[in-house]
């Protein structure tokens, strides 16, 4: 979901998929990577795969694929090595567990959430039957991520807390990347539920711990990825608090971090650039917002992702409107509407229609004057 309207500018965000309601900020639509905003995000990547989710703060164009599909696919592959090799000639209990976990992840990718939950409960019983501590922890983590994906935040936090207890019992410390990944997710969910103080404290603590880790392991890509994810989510919180300059700086730091990990051409970069443009709009720096959106659109062309381009075009139209460039605003919003219809993207169509209505309202107001 992208933030829709320049006032809504910072409204809807991504999933992995998730984010703040952009309408609270301005009127631009956030890009969306995950269903609940989160998605970047990347959002709900499970612990064992050491991934992170990103979201944005405008109307966010839906990333190709389902919520965090890439990361769930990674998780499915990861389970192959979770318990070590197995005899190909005979299906062992461990193999049956791995197969069940993989099926549950495929269900999540297809957004068959009820079926996925049933499969995970079955996997949990199987892991308990063979007394696999790693398997039990992994399944609980997947359950928590599924609940987060479904916006069942209270349930997700409870399960994540149980996972943390298990990790501590296994010898992990507060500096463990797995602990910090969960801490970041809990802080993000607190923000989405409106507990801004808890969210602020959680992000502040998590970033402090990650900074210490990076001093020891500056080239660790998993930690860098989590650092970028957490800064992006923290930036969304600051946007909600009206701290636009601080948010913009965090988004830029997150962007630089992710480029270091992935390179410039990736969905996460598009999402964060969209967030940066939202911050600029709220700071009334429209030229900077425009340039940032144009940079994001160049990336969507390299990614061949026309679905995101529609929302970005609508956001660009709203920036032109703020600048008083009516002709450019109308052209951008009409192109956004066309792209939204062509690629069956209701978020882009809605944002484009909002933009066109704003142009009409502005022109009518000028005529009356």
Swiss-Prot record:
<dbReference type="InterPro" id="IPR040395">
    <property type="entry name" value="TTC19"/>
</dbReference>
<dbReference type="Pfam" id="PF13424">
    <property type="entry name" value="TPR_12"/>
</dbReference>
<dbReference type="GO" id="GO:0034551">
    <property type="term" value="P:mitochondrial respiratory chain complex III assembly"/>
</dbReference>
<feature type="repeat" description="TPR 5">
    <location>
        <begin position="310"/>
        <end position="343"/>
    </location>
</feature>
<keyword id="KW-0496">Mitochondrion</keyword>
<feature type="repeat" description="TPR 1">
    <location>
        <begin position="97"/>
        <end position="130"/>
    </location>
</feature>
<feature type="repeat" description="TPR 4">
    <location>
        <begin position="270"/>
        <end position="303"/>
    </location>
</feature>
<dbReference type="InterPro" id="IPR011990">
    <property type="entry name" value="TPR-like_helical_dom_sf"/>
</dbReference>
<feature type="repeat" description="TPR 3">
    <location>
        <begin position="228"/>
        <end position="261"/>
    </location>
</feature>
<comment type="similarity">
    <text>Belongs to the TTC19 family.</text>
</comment>
<keyword id="KW-0802">TPR repeat</keyword>
<dbReference type="GO" id="GO:0005743">
    <property type="term" value="C:mitochondrial inner membrane"/>
</dbReference>
<comment type="function">
    <text>Required for mitochondrial complex III formation.</text>
</comment>
<keyword id="KW-0809">Transit peptide</keyword>
<feature type="repeat" description="TPR 2">
    <location>
        <begin position="137"/>
        <end position="170"/>
    </location>
</feature>
<keyword id="KW-0677">Repeat</keyword>
<dbReference type="GO" id="GO:0005739">
    <property type="term" value="C:mitochondrion"/>
</dbReference>
<protein>
    <recommendedName>
        <fullName>Tetratricopeptide repeat protein 19 homolog, mitochondrial</fullName>
    </recommendedName>
</protein>
């Amino acid at each position: 979901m992208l933030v829709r309207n320049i006032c809504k500018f910072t409204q809807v965000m991504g999933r992995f998929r998730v984010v703040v309601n952009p309408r609270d900020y301005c009127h631009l639509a956030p890009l969306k990577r995950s269903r609940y905003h989160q998605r970047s995000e990347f959002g709900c990547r499970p612990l064992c795969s050491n991934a992170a989710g990103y979201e944005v703060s405008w109307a966010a164009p839906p990333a190709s694929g389902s919520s965090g599909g890439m990361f769930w696919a990674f998780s499915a592959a990861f389970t192959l090595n979770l318990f070590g090799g197995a005899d190909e000639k005979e299906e062992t209990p461990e193999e049956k567990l791995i197969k069940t976990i993989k099926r549950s992840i495929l269900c999540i990718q297809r957004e068959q959430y009820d079926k996925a939950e049933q499969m995970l409960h079955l996997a949990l019983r199987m892991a308990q039957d063979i007394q696999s501590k790693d398997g039990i922890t992994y399944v609980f983590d997947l359950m928590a991520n599924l609940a987060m994906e479904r916006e069942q935040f209270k349930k997700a936090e409870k399960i994540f807390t149980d996972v943390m207890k298990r990790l501590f019992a296994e010898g992990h410390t507060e500096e463990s990347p797995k602990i910090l990944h969960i801490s970041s997710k809990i802080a993000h969910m607190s923000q989405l539920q409106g507990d801004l103080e808890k969210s602020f404290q959680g992000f502040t603590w998590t970033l402090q711990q990650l900074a210490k880790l990076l001093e020891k392991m500056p080239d660790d890509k998993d930690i860098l990825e989590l650092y970028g994810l957490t800064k992006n989510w923290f930036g969304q919180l600051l946007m909600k608090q009206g701290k636009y300059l601080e948010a913009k700086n965090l988004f830029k730091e997150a962007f630089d971090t992710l480029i270091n990990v992935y390179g410039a051409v990736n969905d996460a970069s598009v999402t964060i650039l969209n967030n940066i443009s939202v911050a600029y709009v709220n700071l009334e720096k429209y030229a900077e917002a425009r340039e940032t959106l144009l940079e994001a659109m160049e990336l969507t062309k390299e990614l061949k992702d026309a679905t995101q381009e529609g929302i970005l075009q609508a956001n660009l139209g709203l920036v032109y409107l703020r600048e008083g460039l009516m002709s450019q605003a109308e052209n951008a919003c009409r192109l956004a509407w066309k792209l939204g219809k062509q690629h069956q993207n209701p978020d882009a169509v809605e944002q484009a229609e909002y933009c066109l209505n704003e142009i009409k309202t502005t022109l009518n107001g000028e005529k009356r004057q």
